Amino acid sequence: MKNLTKIFLSIVLILVLPAMIYGQGPEKAVHIDVEGIEPGTKITYSEFVSRFGKPDSYKKYESEFGLSERYIVGKNKFSCEENGILYNFGLHDNRFRALTTYMDGGIRVGDPFSKLDFLKPDLVKKYDDGSAQYVLFEKISDDKLIVFVKDGIILSMVFNYPL
C-alpha cells in the first residue's frame, strides 16, 4: 500500500510540475475570426474575394517562406504569409465582423464596446485624446485581439498572429 501511494504521488507530481514551473495550465482554445475565417487558415485569392469582396489594393510577392499577400478593402487590411495563411488583420471600418464564433452577428467597428464586456477585456493604455487600447484573451492564449475604443465605441480591431 505504501508503494502504491508513492507511485500515485509521483504520477501527480509529474503531471502538475510543468504547470507549477511555468506558472500556467494548458492554454484554452481561442477562436478569433474575421467573417468566420480564423488566422492560421489558408485562404486563396478567389476565396478572399468571395468572402470579403474584391480588394481595393492587392500585392503579392515571394519571400523566403513562400508567397506573401497584402489585401486592402476600404480601411481594412489583411496579410497572408506562407502561401496564403491568414496572419494579420486590421478592421478600421464597419464592413466586416470579428468574433463571430463568440457572439451572434459578431462585433464591428462602430459597435458599443460594452458588447465585449462578457469577454473581460483588459485595459492596456489610455491616450490623451480620450481613446483607449484594450486586449482580449491575453491571459488565456498567445492569440489576442487588440481593440481601440473612444467614448464607448469601437474604433478599430487588430489581430497579429503570434510568431
Describe the residue ranges of each PLM region.
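Low-complexity, intrinsically disordered Gly/Pro/Thr-rich segments
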Residues: 131-148
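Short helix/turn-capping signatures at newly exposed starts of structured segments
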Residues: 20-129, 149-163
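Bacterial N-terminal signal peptides that target proteins for export
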Residues: 1-9
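Bacterial N-terminal signal peptides
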Residues: 10-19
